[in-house]
């Protein structure tokens, strides 16, 4: 959530910066609510002052033995008007809150202004795409004989679900374990196991609600009269970031660095017809997430560090990639700045997103009321960052495509072999003649 004081000081300036993000701020609606709020607060202050004056007058009158009934009646009337004003003010504050909850974060000044992914800026590349001396297959054709089972996944749960079997399932697990070990042993993160189901207020904290309810899987329990609504997490960023919700963290505890391996559940409501083949876009997929909670003056250094942590995974796997700075129109709702890592997929002859690392500054912290005590001992909002380290399914796709062999086998990257019992290659089972 944005700082409402910023809107009050520079409404037109905020509207301009939100327009760069493709969001049209209803300036008239905000101004009208603010005017009404100020009028009520001014009137309430006047009433409070009048009531205080009358209370003193009543005391003096009683000391003189005078009749106070008329003054007492006026005080009672003031009390009734103040209660009505409180109700009205609460309604206005609620409408302001609803308006604020729908506003995306303001982009950092270093973010390129643009409309969509066509305006993103490439920063750097690492690795050289492999030159194949045979016809390259995509991950579906490579993986199906090795244990990718799209047919059973669809039979069990419908489109965009996949079952993994045998060595492919083991390779998927090996990737997640390798990522966790790298982040915990080399990058200083604390491994965390989180709930996969969370309450609605948790999603308000990280910005998925109210705007993206259609992208979430909702879970309801209880009878018709006592229904409890919860949601499956779309990323463990949600649960990891909310661990500091409604708390004041000691400055000495910062930075807090958490990582988790979890399934992620997304309805992909706006993705009809996109990436329908294979594992690129799934309703359920695994991801190793990185979250940092830091002091405001260190958050952009932390963002660079987090990008480096995601890059390290790709480099250790020997997968070519590039780093992209997202433009204002392509960033996620809560982000102030985002870097995407895109891995090379030879069958598509292009780079595809495999990690997204974002600094939300105080946007999520304000919604969660997550604070720390600064050097002056005063509570101050923390900054929160999140990043994929990496999406496990898409990393599996990249390994299958980049490490495929002409005979249909897949070479296991060296860093994964300890997690695969020393296996160097995944071969398709021999078909009976």
Swiss-Prot record:
CDD domains: SerRS_core
Alphabetized GO MF terms: ATP binding; serine-tRNA ligase activity
UniProt main location, coarse: cytoplasm
Any one biological process term the GO annotation gives: seryl-tRNA aminoacylation
Protein residues bound to L-serine: 235-237, 289, 388
Chemical reaction(s) catalysed: tRNA(Ser) + L-serine + ATP = L-seryl-tRNA(Ser) + AMP + diphosphate + H(+); tRNA(Sec) + L-serine + ATP = L-seryl-tRNA(Sec) + AMP + diphosphate + H(+)
Enzyme Commission identifier(s): 6.1.1.11
PROSITE patterns attached to this UniProt entry: AA_TRNA_LIGASE_II
UniProt-annotated location(s): Cytoplasm
Pathway: Aminoacyl-tRNA biosynthesis; selenocysteinyl-tRNA(Sec) biosynthesis; L-seryl-tRNA(Sec) from L-serine and tRNA(Sec): step 1/1
Enzyme class per UniProt: ligase
GO cellular component, one term: cytoplasm
UniProt KW keywords: Aminoacyl-tRNA synthetase, ATP-binding, Cytoplasm, Ligase, Nucleotide-binding, Protein biosynthesis
Domain of life: Bacteria
Cross-referenced SUPFAM superfamilies: Class II aaRS and biotin synthetases, tRNA-binding arm
Self-association state and partner proteins as the record states: Homodimer. The tRNA molecule binds across the dimer.
PANTHER family: SERINE--TRNA LIGASE, SERYL-TRNA SYNTHETASE
Function: Catalyzes the attachment of serine to tRNA(Ser). Is also able to aminoacylate tRNA(Sec) with serine, to form the misacylated tRNA L-seryl-tRNA(Sec), which will be further converted into selenocysteinyl-tRNA(Sec).
Domain comment as written in the entry: Consists of two distinct domains, a catalytic core and a N-terminal extension that is involved in tRNA binding.
Family: Belongs to the class-II aminoacyl-tRNA synthetase family. Type-1 seryl-tRNA synthetase subfamily.
Protein name: Serine--tRNA ligase
The species this protein was found in: Burkholderia vietnamiensis (strain G4 / LMG 22486)
Name of the coding gene: serS
